[in-house]
C-alpha cells in the first residue's frame, strides 16, 4: 500500500490500531437496521416481504404480492417515492418484482425511505 501524505498514513494507522470499537458498533447498528426494516415492513407494508439476509447490508424486498409489473414498480420507486433502489431486473428475469435497499445508513433515513415505499403502495 502506498500512502503519499502524512495525514493519510496517520488515518490508516488509527483505523487499524483503534478502529475495533467503531467497527463493532457499526456492525451492531446495521444489524439493528435490518431488524427495524423487517419489523417495519411486517407492520406497515403487508404486500411486501423481506428476504432473510445472509451477511450483507443489502436487503431484498419482494413486491410480487402488490401485483405491480417490474416496470410500474420501478416507475413508482423512482418517480413517486424519489428513491434509487437496485431494481431486481438488473439481476435477470427472476429478479423482476424485487428491489434491493441499502440499510447501512442512519435509521432516520431508512425510516423515511420505508415511509415513502409505504405511501406509493397505498390503495393497491
Q: What are the language-model segments listed below?
A:
Residues 3-124:
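PLP-dependent class I/II
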Amino acid at each position: 500500500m502506498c500512502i503519499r501524505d502524512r495525514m493519510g498514513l496517520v488515518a490508516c494507522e488509527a483505523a487499524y490500531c483503534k478502529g475495533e470499537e467503531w467497527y463493532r458498533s457499526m456492525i451492531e447498528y446495521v444489524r439493528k437496521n435490518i431488524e427495524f426494516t423487517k419489523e417495519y415492513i411486517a407492520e406497515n407494508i403487508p404486500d411486501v416481504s423481506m428476504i432473510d439476509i445472509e451477511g450483507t447490508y443489502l436487503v431484498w424486498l419482494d413486491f410480487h404480492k402488490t401485483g405491480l409489473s417490474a416496470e410500474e414498480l420501478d416507475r413508482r420507486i423512482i418517480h413517486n417515492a424519489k428513491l434509487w433502489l437496485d431494481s431486481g431486473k438488473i439481476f435477470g428475469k427472476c429478479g423482476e418484482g424485487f428491489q434491493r435497499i441499502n440499510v447501512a445508513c442512519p435509521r432516520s433515513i431508512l425510516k423515511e425511505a420505508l415511509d415513502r415505499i409505504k405511501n406509493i403502495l397505498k390503495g393497491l
